[in-house]
Amino acid sequence: MDERLLSGESAYEDADLEYSLRPQTLRQYIGQDKAKHNLEVFIEAAKMREETLDHVLLYGPPGLGKTTLANIIANEMGVNIRTTSGPAIERPGDLAAVLTALQPGDVLFIDEIHRLHRSIEEVLYPAMEDFCLDIVIGKGPTARSVRLDLPPFTLVGATTRAGALSAPLRDRFGVLSRLEYYTVDQLSAIVERTAEVFEVEIDSLAALEIARRARGTPRIANRLLRRVRDFAQVRGDGTIAMEITQMALELLQVDKLGLDHIDHKFLLGIIEKFRGGPVGLETVSATIGEESHTIEDVYEPYLLQIGFLQRTPRGRIVTPLAYQHFGMEMPKI
């Protein structure tokens, strides 16, 4: 996949910044009001009963704050968090090592939990339900199963593809929270807060302009702010004003709706080669040279959100709004 400024996926350079900007409490966390309010109630109730919080599944597009919320849950509960990911747990023994290292009440955060192998999931079921671990010692006829007790813990799973989780795993989560795209006002507040951390002056209109082009995603808003700051320091006086912001975003090929050259390639490919659709996912994948799951998980969610694309039983269709955005007329049937 092309290097993409507007990807919601975490990049290497995002890690340190996101850690330094990460709010520590639900009160500090901007946006996701519904999920935040519910978690506040569930956490307070668990603390009042002196119990661990029910297992939590956070799902939604990348870059919306799932990792941040997992850390906040641990902070609010006053416990430690251990972090891993679905791809990192390759064998049942890997999971057993993580589970047996937990202390009572700890939060275990598994990112990309939909990528756990089914054999790993089966080890996880009794751990989630009964706080125990069944392991097999030996091989062949002499093999025997041993059950180990685990301390009570809270599993927080994060995924961009909730539908890819097996039903037995999904059903074992007591709390399911979908994270939604952020509003422009919420993103503008995040941009201004990040600018304070950077100790750089930003115009409120410039913050709004960055927010409008950030695809409803805080990670993208902060990434755009970093790049605009570069232009402000090199081509301006260091202040992030509206004029330098617009110039920087145009040079970065981020249009007024937050679409970049890859979005243009995707939409125009369907328009020019397939008369706007309908066209099958695999055909689009072959045409633009991207894997189908990348198209589904990375490209399409925002295009669906802004009404530029429709998924139908017959395939993908580019909408009149997209034609209008490109200044093109829809083909006559």
Curated annotation (Swiss-Prot):
Localization (cell): Cytoplasm
Gene3D superfamilies: 1.10.8.60, P-loop containing nucleotide triphosphate hydrolases, Winged helix-like DNA-binding domain superfamily/Winged helix DNA-binding domain
Region (Large ATPase domain (RuvB-L)) residue spans: 1-182
CDD domains, per database record: AAA
Cellular-component GO terms for this entry: cytoplasm; Holliday junction resolvase complex
Primary subcellular site in the record, as a coarse category: cytoplasm
One MF term in the entry's GO annotations: four-way junction helicase activity
Top-level enzyme category: hydrolase
InterPro entries assigned: AAA+_ATPase, AAA_lid_4, DNA_helicase_Holl-junc_RuvB, P-loop_NTPase, RuvB-like_N, RuvB_C, WH-like_DNA-bd_sf, WH_DNA-bd_sf
Region feature (Head domain (RuvB-H)): 256-333
Record-listed Mg(2+) binding positions: 67
Pfam families named in the record: AAA_lid_4, RuvB_C, RuvB_N
Catalytic activity as recorded in UniProt: ATP + H2O = ADP + phosphate + H(+)
Family label: Belongs to the RuvB family.
Function: The RuvA-RuvB-RuvC complex processes Holliday junction (HJ) DNA during genetic recombination and DNA repair, while the RuvA-RuvB complex plays an important role in the rescue of blocked DNA replication forks via replication fork reversal (RFR). RuvA specifically binds to HJ cruciform DNA, conferring on it an open structure. The RuvB hexamer acts as an ATP-dependent pump, pulling dsDNA into and through the RuvAB complex. RuvB forms 2 homohexamers on either side of HJ DNA bound by 1 or 2 RuvA tetramers; 4 subunits per hexamer contact DNA at a time.
Subunit structure, as described in the record: Homohexamer. Forms an RuvA(8)-RuvB(12)-Holliday junction (HJ) complex. HJ DNA is sandwiched between 2 RuvA tetramers; dsDNA enters through RuvA and exits via RuvB. An RuvB hexamer assembles on each DNA strand where it exits the tetramer. Each RuvB hexamer is contacted by two RuvA subunits (via domain III) on 2 adjacent RuvB subunits; this complex drives branch migration. In the full resolvosome a probable DNA-RuvA(4)-RuvB(12)-RuvC(2) complex forms which resolves the HJ.
Protein name: Holliday junction branch migration complex subunit RuvB
Native organism: Bacillus cytotoxicus (strain DSM 22905 / CIP 110041 / 391-98 / NVH 391-98)
